[in-house]
Amino acid sequence: MEKTKTKQGENEHMPVNNPSTQIYQLQALASELKTGFTEAMQELSRIQHGEYALEEKVKSCRCSMEEKVTEMKNSLNYFKEELSNAMSMIQAITSKQEEMQQKIEQLQQEKRRESRKVKAKKTQKEEHSSQAGPAQAQGSPFRSINIPEPVLPSEDFTNLLPSQAYEKAQESRSVHVGDSNVKGMMGPGVNPTTPEAEENLKSCLSADIQSKGHLPSGMWRQPKDGKEWGEEYVTKDHPDKLKEAGQGRHSSLENVLCETSLAAKRQTVALELLESERKYVINISLILKIKATFQGSDGKRNSKERSLFPGSLRYLVQQHLDLLHALQERVLKWPRQGVLGDLFLKLTNDENNFLDYYVAYLRDLPECISLVHVVVLKEGDEEIKSDIYTLFFHIVQRIPEYLIHLQNVLKFTEQEHPDYYLLLVCVQRLRVFISHYTLLFQCNEDLLIQKRKKLKKSSMAKLYKGLASQCANAGQDASPTAGPEAVRDTGIHSEELLQPYPSAPSSGPAITHLMPPVKKSQQQQSLMESMQPGKPSDWELEGRKHERPESLLAPTQFCAAEQDVKALAGPLQAIPEMDFESSPAEPLGNVERSLRAPAELLPDARGFVPAAYEEFEYGGEIFALPAPYDEEPFQAPALFENCSPASSESSLDICFLRPVSFAMEAERPEHPLQPLPKSATSPAGSSSAYKLEAAAQAHGKAKPLSRSLKEFPRAPPADGVAPRLYSTRSSSGGRAPIKAERAAQAHGPAAAAVAARGASRTFFPQQRSQSEKQTYLEVRREMHLEDTTRFCPKEERESEQTSFSDQNPRQDQKGGFRSSFRKLFKKKNGNATGEDFCGPWGWW
């Protein structure tokens, strides 16, 4: 029973399990079918998209091919039109040539008739006249212009272009015919060595406009179908109609004449361009030769000296060589319509880097010029440096020269010419390039011209030294003018003699600079001694020795270059006090020269001296001395007549000069800068305050001076020695007492006393704000003043402990400074009488 029950249970469960598995299987099949169907649909859509893309590509290719085909058709049609126009023009020209040949033949016939008539009249006059000489002179019309009797070879006239004959007949009826014009206007089958054809044609045209006695019996008859020749048969009885016929013939040839003359002029301009390019390539090849000699002479030079020449130079040389070959091929095989614009269009194209390399050359040139100056100065060969400057200048000027040449070619090019548009584009490109880099061009040109002038002056200085040594050896008197033999011996170019130094006003001291050369040590010693402070006679002697016109920007060139660099720091140091003794009758010119002498001794210090020195504050105006030492005439010379360079023995009179630090003084743009006369930098600058006052009065901007300055004596005392007034350079003058207190806190009581003393002396108005920071230059100046106080007597240092200012009136009531001031000058001057001493600025 149990077995049967289990079998029945299994049978009952079997139909229940089978449908579920079938359902699962069906669901799996359905999902598989669904995924396969979606994949098939995706593949189908992908195929459809690919077909669409292919169809679009095919359509685009078809459109592009159709456009190209239409363009080709249009170009072919345009080419056909051009060919048809050219054929029509050729046919018109050939027809005109045939007409002109016919006219020339008719002219030959008429001339033969005329010559026969002239010969007949000549024979008649010879028979009836007793003097054969005058009869011959009057009979032939060719005798007056020295033309031989015409022999008419008709085969030469048939090939002659009509434009030559009529152009020559219109311009001048003379024998002077240029060979170039004859060759340029002849046809291909013409022999240019047949002057009979020209002479015959000229004589026949001159015979047409002669007087009535030589009129021909008849003229040629023009065919009825001619457009420009409509005159009828002209007889001997109608001379007016003969003249009109001649004018009609000349007017008909204007077009041919104009075209031929323009072509000839255009060819000559192209030849000029080729010749200039040939010379230019020769010049720049010389630069490469000089570069090779510089690099080969010394292999141990550093990289800076090896870059004496711009790196783009070799590329530019190659480009100009290619251009020269192309121009030779074009110009020497010049066709009827020569084309040059495509060469320059390719040269100035953006793909070609010619203009970029040219700009790189212009930018590298100033540094290369400075290196050339240093290296050649070291080697001592100035002729090579002169040649290098000249060749550099040629390269700078080449692009403007191209513009001029192309404009000349464009001037003689018609608008219908195929080269017209190309030349127009090239000219426009060059104009834009030159206008864009005008400043670069101008800077390089000015630099090269300036270097060339300085080189000529230095070579003239060497020439003078050589002449002086020759004169010293020969025992003869030195002469400032150089002979040709001396010039030849010294190796100076003849063109450099054209710009010598002008002679000095006084003939005696003018020859003092013609001195034999000495050793370097002696030159250095003499130069340094000349820069040290001395007597006025020494300064005057040096001023006369190095005297030159003030218009020259370059300083004297008589010092060696190494000494010039070493001697630069001499005049820029602090200048101590000096005791000058000069007579009151010293002329103003000597004083001016003595004041100008130390600045004249400075060599070319443009690269070593900063662009502006420390300002002078005076009367609301600020004066500054620029670096190139700009000379200015004295504003009021009468103020200097009573001035003496003698110095008082006061330790308060200090005149020193320090250059401005740009890093420190760059934040002061509110002060206007005005040039100060050069004598303010000299050791003998005792009258510099007078110069400031004179300049301010001349400009009409000077404020009223203080009472103490007005009380200063202008005339010298009885003993002939006047106290000297220096221009104070103390930056602490004219400031608030806060400035002095700040200086006292920073540098101690001694510096505070010195700063306060400087503040009491000054009469300048307050220019700067109190919140302005103390610069490094002011700190150094106060330290310098602090050093000077160590040499003062003990009583003076004790009296300086009392700080005061002219803006604080309470200090004046105490009288501490006045008493110490009196004690100081009583002790130093030995004033035993006890008189009240009046300082250089009067009582405060």
Curated annotation (Swiss-Prot):
Basic and acidic residues: bias regions: 1-13, 101-113, 787-800
Biased composition (Basic residues): 820-829
Keyword Coiled coil belongs to the record: yes
Region (Disordered): 1-20, 101-142, 169-189, 498-541, 668-687, 702-745, 787-844
Compositional bias segments (type: Polar residues): 130-142
Coiled coil (residue ranges): 54-129
Gene Ontology molecular function: any one: guanyl-nucleotide exchange factor activity
Keyword field contains ATP-binding: no
PROSITE patterns to which the protein is assigned, alphabetical: DH_2 (PS50010)
A Pfam entry, by short name: RhoGEF
PANTHER family associated with the record: RHO GUANINE NUCLEOTIDE EXCHANGE FACTOR 33 (PTHR46944:SF1)
Protein name (database record): Rho guanine nucleotide exchange factor 33
Gene: ARHGEF33
